């Protein structure tokens, strides 16, 4: 097995351990979680981990609402970042700042880190401006996301 693939497999396995919201996760996802908590402090980041057709695992079909559309755009943004040589968005850390609900990506990030930071920053801002519909949490993906 390719060492890079083995590293990814190990990271995914480690990130899936645990049974609570304190489970380990790749560092970038930890940073994204913190960005979400910066812009939407009234909700748990976990509320966004299994929402609609695009927030969380997978992503297909038509977004169910504006919040789900934020996740679709975020997925597409990560796909674009992956085109940067050696850029793995789910594992790339970056420098940013949260101050009173405002997110800023720091200037010292390399091209990949800057792209991923901006993807996460824009998604967190989008989440803050989109209504949350409890009926779109943990939906039946096969029935609603074709």
UniProtKB/Swiss-Prot annotation:
Tissue: Expressed by the venom gland.
Propiece residue ranges: 22-27
Co-factor binding comment: Binds 1 Ca(2+) ion.
Catalytic activity: a 1,2-diacyl-sn-glycero-3-phosphocholine + H2O = a 1-acyl-sn-glycero-3-phosphocholine + a fatty acid + H(+)
Signal peptide: 1-21
Enzyme class: hydrolase
InterPro entries assigned: PLipase_A2, PLipase_A2_Asp_AS, PLipase_A2_dom, PLipase_A2_dom_sf, PLipase_A2_His_AS
Amino-acid positions noted as binding Ca(2+) in the UniProt annotation, renumbered to this chain: 54, 56, 58, 75
Family: Belongs to the phospholipase A2 family. Group I subfamily. D49 sub-subfamily.
Official protein name in the record: Acidic phospholipase A2 2
Organism: Naja kaouthia
């Amino acid at each position: 097995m390719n060492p890079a693939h083995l590293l990814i497999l190990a990271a995914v396995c480690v990130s899936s351990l645990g049974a609570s919201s304190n489970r380990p996760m790749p560092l970038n996802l930890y940073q994204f979680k913190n960005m979400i908590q910066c812009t939407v402090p009234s909700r748990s980041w976990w509320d966004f981990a299994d929402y609609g057709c695009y927030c969380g695992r997978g992503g297909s079909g038509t977004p169910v609402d504006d919040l789900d559309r934020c996740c679709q755009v975020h997925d597409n943004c990560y796909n674009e970042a992956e085109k940067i040589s050696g850029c793995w968005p789910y594992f790339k850390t970056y420098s940013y700042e949260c101050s009173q609900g405002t997110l800023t990506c720091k200037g010292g990030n390399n091209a990949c880190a800057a792209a991923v930071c901006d993807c996460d920053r824009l998604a967190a801002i989008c989440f803050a401006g989109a209504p949350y519909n409890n009926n779109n949490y943990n939906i039946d993906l096969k029935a609603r996301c074709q």
